[in-house]
Amino acid sequence: FFSEELMESDERLKFISNFSGSAGWGVITASHKLKSAIISDGRYQEQLKKEVSQKEFVILDGGLNKIIEFLNLYKQIKIIGVDTKLITINQFKFLESELKIKNIKFMLSTKNLVDEIWNNKPTIPQQKIVDVDTKYVGENFVSKIKRLSKIILNHSSEALITFKPDAISWLLNIRGNQLKYTPVVRCFALIHKSKKIHLFFEHDLPQLSKLDHGEIIFTNMNKFQSILKMFAGESFLVDYNSTPLFVLSALKKNKIKYKHISCPISSLKVIKNSVEQKNFKEVHKIDGLAFIKFWSWFEHLDKNNMFDEEYL
């Protein structure tokens, strides 16, 4: 879900390289004669040097564009495998356009090769969904869905697919518990103009919430293709910046038309109602108190001892 906080079962970059930062790209070469690459931004350059073997990896500072730079070092690389579940549509479009002149071919797959060698991979924990009472958010999910449905219709489409757990959690007034610090519900959604919603989850379905009824259906991710067959010939809205590449091939396979839209749920949720504004102020007070307690503790530390950011 392209989140900076991952479950242990998603930490493929850490497994293959020992890099434990929250953002990064990996390019793993097939030949032992060529170094692989680890790419992350300036926040993690010192951490990369500590955690990653520079005998095995080239460490690059930046983002997706550094993959191009790495491939310029090793011009003998002509075929690149891509996990279409771990790259967004626009990210792939960028790579494709930049590498076209280099005659590099892509091998697209929904299987991840790291998973193939990851013995004793951590299991995905059971997800429990908590419903957030309207008194805390100021608008029930039925009203929010109705507003979203109008946007879908105004774009001459039948449905929206979104891979943004924060947007889905806001829309349906729900929270999840799979991540330690980010209480979103990890799923993706197919939201139809008829107001019927399919929520797709990894492996075991979550413990039931009041949402799991006729109009909102909890479904396993492996049913995505079969669900799409129901909508053949329709037109979908897709956010190319947050939707993984495999979705496009699934839509094409089921003869569903699609077009790009910046996630309309994100646009809706950024405008806070009066209840949300009031509760934001209360949360800021709690947050401020926590900071004051921390600062008091910090001020009373024994200054004769050496402390660094890792200790703190």
Per-range role (PLM):
Residues 98-123, 243-279:
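Terminal amphipathic helices with adjacent charged low-complexity linkers/tails
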Residues 1-73, 83, 87, 91-230, ...:
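N-terminal accessory/capping or targeting/presequence segment of soluble
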Residues 77-81, 208-264, 269:
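Conserved catalytic alpha/beta cores of large enzymes that bind or transform nucleotide phosphates
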Residues 26, 80, 280:
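Divalent metal-coordination and catalytic microenvironments
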Residues 1-2, 165-168, 241-244, 297-299, ...:
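A glycine-rich phosphate-binding loop feature that marks nucleotide/adenosyl-phosphate handling sites
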Residues 267-312:
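Long, K/E/R/D-enriched contiguous segments that form extended
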Residues 49-51, 230-231, 257-263, 290-299:
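Short acidic (Asp/Glu) and glycine-rich catalytic loops that position anionic groups and cofactors
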